[in-house]
Amino acid sequence: MSDFAAKWDQDGKRFYEIGVDRGVFYPLSDEGTYENGEAWSGLSNVTNKPEGADVNDVWADNMKYLSIRAAEKFGATIECYSYPDGFKACNGEEEVVPGVTVSGQTRKAFGFSYRSRIGNDIKFQDYGYKIHLIYKATASPVEKSYGTINDSTDVDAMSYDVETTGLEVGTINGIEYRPTSHIEIDSTKVDPALLATFEEIIYGIEGSTTPKMPLPAEVFELFGGSVVPSIEINKHL
């Protein structure tokens, strides 16, 4: 029997992803930056929903000549039991006077980050994690019901469908990339020192800096990419 180069189910290489935590909300400033982030407690689920990329078959010479795919866009669903005060403006709510809020206002764009765990068969969910960055997102209106209190312990959850607009990435290490609104950072593959610096940026340092989400080109530059932006980094709106 041949000794195959491909190896299946080796110890330490049975990977999976689980969990969601460390959510952070970042309001989009008029200058196109994502600063003054707020911790988003109460996250219960985040679903990434890429859409588009529909296939269009081209026929010639009485046969299928080729397949072309349309552009892809990124969306998500955020499920939670609460949200930070700053998210109210992104939900079409404005506090007119302290404690009194009106709805139906302009929905502002925002940035969002969260963490998912990476597990394996040895370290389980402590093997590593991914940090997800979502840019220039807007939340769609959703219904919210209020039910009577009874002998069950169900808590009313909220769910927000999110659409995004891609930001310029530029040319990195000689390769030109399309605009994106979603980036993942894998803790098991990046330099730990650079990751620590990155986390200080996106989560802030108590008593020193507030959470800030770097723009895509800034993220790649921090982790060692040689970036040539196609337009000025902070002039993407």
Set out the residue ranges of the language-model regions:
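Polar/acidic, low-complexity leader/linker segments enriched in S/T/G and N/D
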Residues: 1-48
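Short, charge-rich amphipathic segments
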Residues: 3-12, 25-31, 90-96, 114-120, ...
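Short amphipathic beta-strand and strand-loop transition segments with alternating hydrophobic
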Residues: 25, 44-48, 64-66, 139-147
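Acidic Ser/Thr/Pro-rich low-complexity disordered segments
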Residues: 33-34, 116-128, 172-181, 188-190
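Mixed-charge, glycine-accented linear interaction segment located at domain edges/termini
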Residues: 141-235
